[in-house]
Amino acid sequence: MRKANYDRFPSTKISGTVIQGWENICSLLEEHLKAYPALAVDFYTGVYEEEVINELHRLSPALFIDTRDLMKPESEIKAMTARFMTDDVLFGYVTNITLNDYFDQDKLKKAREEVIATKGKVVVVGSGAAM
């Protein structure tokens, strides 16, 4: 039998702490929010967004922002990305579009102002949360 030339079980060793369970995660976040009352949770493909959002409400923030609410309308995004799309589901074209281009700049500006003005905990979740 031929030996595979790739690692079937890849892993990366990291140092640090792993927290398991939403109660423990939220407790740790509460401690960190005492020092700096703003939390940005950026999402990546495959994250169970609704679960994370629901659980982060445990933190009882004064302001909770979901970045999906700051995006341009879907029709604008489709128009913006159309020239990079092909009929092939795997291949398209390299784009010069940035993450910032997907956001409605007026909504983004207003959200930033709300974050600055808010007294108390702020939680921003979603793709581009740290923007």
Give the positions of each predicted feature.
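Conserved beta-strand segments of the P-loop GTPase G domain that flank and frequently precede/overlap
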Residues: 40-42, 65, 124-125
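ATP-dependent small-molecule kinase phosphotransfer cores
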Residues: 2-24, 51, 60-121
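Glycine-rich P-loop/Walker A and Walker A-like loops and their local beta1-loop-alpha1 context
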Residues: 14-58
